[in-house]
Amino acid sequence: MIEAAAYILIGGQSRRFGSPKWKARIGNETVLNRILYSCKEFETQQLVGKYRPSKYKVPFIQDKHKIQAPIIGLHTALQQSKHDWNLIISCDLPLMTNSIMDRLWGKRKTGSDVIIPVVNDMLQTTCAFYHRKLLDLCKAGIQNNMLSLNDLVRASTYIEVDFSDQTDAFLNMNTKEDLVSIKKKLL
């Protein structure tokens, strides 16, 4: 069991994708179901977004900010969380696995604020553990219109975890073409 909360970001306008990404299907399951399965070891799982998805019994937190940015979802999650550590994961990572979650969780250290995967020298900010003590820094970023999660991470004490051996798990699904490519990886 991972003694943390998993917050799945389902918001976003999905302009390039054309419809809510969490509804996209891979085989006989939705992308959201795949993400929920990858988070099955967490004490709690919650969805964060503008609108509650129908047909899901997973607890939902409505994001009330008008701004569309992952830092808004992080802020909403940290405000609600009763856990010190909180996974923030975007619903556009349909190849994510629970073994990656376990590996990340195993790297936490006292005094750190963020445990973050790195793939091809890029921080994977929408699949990382954030400590609840970042709430004030997150709030200040939003108030100052500094909405970059990369900037937030770099302003904190963070642990990088190299996932160059599992780059496919971090393939981001932004377009229908991305979805086709991801489906091909599963064949």
Where are each of the predicted segments found?
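Nucleotide and nucleotide-moiety/phosphate-recognizing core
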Residues: M1-M146, D151-F170, K176-E177, K183-L187
